[in-house]
């Protein structure tokens, strides 16, 4: 039985090459999230706090990046970042079905990020959208400005907040776009 992500079936196996002069072949059979002690039941992240969920998402994003052609991934620094093939990548996660990813409208993406990996933890296994950072910055700022204008220019309940969201429909086009991280894709 094939695992289901929020976007549809998740590949049963993925192969990739890693390493430099020493050739290494890695085959990941079913990149799935199984919590310790859960047998092989789907993810249940209910017992994790927000920091643990972000770490869980970040480590799965790192593994998926390697499985999809990236050669070097570092998990270090702030909880929302990875270094993939020398480029900073921001990781954002969600765990509630139907909920958007939460961001700041003023700074939706860290300044030095080349891309954002949106990790969807609402299905049986983690699923990923990989979007160019500048596209995310522009989209969030534009969407927030339009929303704010529709409210008369002032946020109704908390005027000082710049809290914004990224809805699934706004990033669906970046589903499984690992080529964005390698810089070989046209960023449409």
Label each region the model flagged:
Residues 2-188:
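Nucleic-acid endonuclease domains
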